[in-house]
Amino acid sequence: MPSPKRTKFRKQHRGRLKGIATRSNSICFGKFALQALEPAWITARQIEAGRRAITRYARRGGKLWIRIFPDKPITARPAETRMGSGKGSPEYWVAIAKPGKILYEIGGVSENVAEAAMKIAAYKMPIRTAFIGININ
């Protein structure tokens, strides 16, 4: 699972998912991409599941770029623990995806292969997504 090697602080506030993605909202590396249409936290496990799905479908052809990284720690309390006594310990990591954010990019494969691979990865995501390409509108 992808996670930061080290962070300045162990725990973070939850924050709010307001607005649209102003950065990382256009294709930079490949020819085709999977773009988020809704705001959500995407866990490291979901990112990894999508990566595996795309690489398995595309086989050896093409190159994949993962444009999101889980850098936000999510804390959880142990089961049957009384309230109080501080915040829980970090359990897993999430990436913040706002509408318009590019999740994955792929290049070096045909449009049909790219679309099918991204569709499989889209099923692994907790949000609605769109398949976009440089030549497609």
UniProtKB/Swiss-Prot annotation:
Its main location: plastid. Keywords: Plastid, Ribonucleoprotein, Ribosomal protein. This is Large ribosomal subunit protein uL16c. InterPro entries: Ribosomal_uL16, Ribosomal_uL16_bact-type, Ribosomal_uL16_CS, Ribosomal_uL16_dom, Ribosomal_uL16_sf. It is found in: Plastid. It comes from Aneura mirabilis (Parasitic liverwort). It comes from the Eukaryota. One of its GO terms (molecular function) is structural constituent of ribosome. GO terms for biological process: mitochondrial translation. Belongs to the universal ribosomal protein uL16 family. Part of the 50S ribosomal subunit. PROSITE patterns: RIBOSOMAL_L16_1, RIBOSOMAL_L16_2. GO terms for cellular component: mitochondrial large ribosomal subunit; plastid.
